[in-house]
Amino acid sequence: MPQKPKAYVLDSWAVLSYFHDEPAGERVENIIADARDAAIPLLMSVVNAAEVWYITARRRSAADADSGIQVLREFGVHFIEADWTLAKEAGRFKAKNRMSFADCFAAALAKNRKASLVTGDREFKQVQSEVTISWLKN
């Protein structure tokens, strides 16, 4: 049986797949439930939370975006502020890889917290030698 991670970092790709009832959303729901049952922290950078917010606001409405963030809070997701340590690590990922800056924050948080990053975004293949990834598929 694989060892449980110290924590999970949720990328916006994972959260949006859950919110929009995409195929990977069911696995995200299971990861969240398993994490709560096993007292494994669920983390998300505020940068990635903002990404979820603006994408949801564009596709639906600002009210739906606010509700989505509230759902994450109710699931027990801890929003992690972008301090200098996290921002510098994100900058290091950005300097070395061709990926969005928001994705660099998710990777940096997972690396700094020794957590498993939950995503299906293929941009993260570039950093999988430095970050543990729980891959999702749609």
Place the predicted regions along the sequence by residue.
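Acidic, PIN/NYN-like endoribonuclease modules and their adjacent C-terminal/linker elements
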Residues: 1-7, 107-138
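Short, well-structured N-terminal submotif of metal-dependent ribonuclease cores
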Residues: 1-44, 57-70
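Active-site neighborhoods of divalent-metal-dependent phosphate/nucleic-acid chemistry enzymes
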Residues: 3, 78-118
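Acidic active-site catalytic centers that drive phospho-/nucleotidyl reactions
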Residues: 11, 51, 103, 121
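A generic structural signal for short hydrophobic patches within well-formed alpha-helices
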Residues: 15-16, 49, 124-125
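Short beta->alpha linker loops
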Residues: 23, 47-48, 82-85, 105, ...
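Anion (oxyanion) recognition and catalysis
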Residues: 36, 73, 111
